[in-house]
Amino acid sequence: FLSKNTLPNFPSFIEATHHGPTALKSPVLFAEIGSTDTEYANQDAGELMARCLLEVCKEWKYKRKAVDADRVAIGFGGTHYCQKFTKLMLDSNFEFPYIFSKYGLPEANSLTIRQAIEKSLEPVEIALIEKKSMNAQTRDQLIASLKEVGLNYEMV
């Protein structure tokens, strides 16, 4: 949806997960428009966000799919605003139900990774690791956790 519906001078990014996995039993989607009063007051951005959220809800209601993506992945690494994962989502048709940013990697153990997989609406196929955003020790610990839960991975 976002690849075909943009606003001039108003970039769209996906954000790293910072609210879960949660204990909620229903699907959860967090969305926000910017981080200042200027963005919050942008009516065009609000309308685009509303259309985007309605599209996601329609996909789920009628197709029982969260999105129409080719591949579903959990992302690991990067910053709060996930530019690399946003590009993969838009250019390669990936879906990211969870992204553990660089600052969230200490919580990315086998338990939380398993929860992220189980609580995703679509079956998670692979983990994508932003290699340059973490040191070798962190990457090795992450890979060990991914192997423990049986999730294949690729470096991006």
Residue ranges of model-derived segments:
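Active-site-adjacent mobile loop/cap segments within catalytic or ligand-binding domains
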Residues: F13-W60
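Acidic, Ser/Thr-rich low-complexity intrinsically disordered segments
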Residues: K65-A136
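Short, solvent-exposed amphipathic alpha-helical segments in soluble enzyme
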Residues: E47-L48, L90-S92, L142-E148
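Short, surface-exposed recognition loops or helix-turn segments adjacent to catalytic cores
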Residues: L7-P21, K61-G75
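C-terminal functional modules of predominantly eukaryotic multidomain proteins
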Residues: E130-V156
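A short, contiguous, amphipathic alpha-helix enriched in charged residues
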Residues: F1-L7
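Well-ordered, non-membrane alpha-helical segments in soluble/globular domains
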Residues: G46-A50, S110-R114, R139-Q141
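Short acidic/glycine-rich loop or secondary-structure boundary segments that cap or lie
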Residues: P21-T22, E39-Y40, C82-F85, Q137
